[in-house]
From Swiss-Prot:
Gene name of the record: psbZ
Protein name: Photosystem II reaction center protein Z
Family matches, as Pfam families: Ycf9 (PF01737)
Listed transmembrane segments: 8-28, 41-61
Keywords (A to Z) from UniProt: Chloroplast, Membrane, Photosynthesis, Photosystem II, Plastid, Reaction center, Thylakoid, Transmembrane, Transmembrane helix
Record localization: Plastid, Chloroplast thylakoid membrane
InterPro entries in UniProt: PSII_PsbZ, PSII_PsbZ_sf
Major subcellular site: plastid
Keyword Magnesium set for record: no
Length: 62
């Protein structure tokens, strides 16, 4: 169970880092938002899911 928690935290940190870089690039590029809207929403949905997963796994470990 601990390894699953550690992998979930690593995935959350990696997703946060990717979104931290990619979202401003999408907004700064001309025509970036309209063509990359689905990718940004998918990344955000993944991030929200990982936040809940880390919270659930944390409650099981503690």
């Amino acid at each position: 169970m601990t390894i699953a928690f550690q992998l979930a935290v690593f995935a959350l940190i990696a997703t946060s880092s990717i979104l931290l870089i990619s979202v401003p690039v999408v907004f700064a590029s001309p025509d970036g938002w309209s063509s990359n809207k689905n990718i940004v929403f998918s990344g955000t949905s993944l991030w929200i899911g990982l936040v809940f997963l880390v919270g659930i796994l944390n409650s099981l470990i503690s």
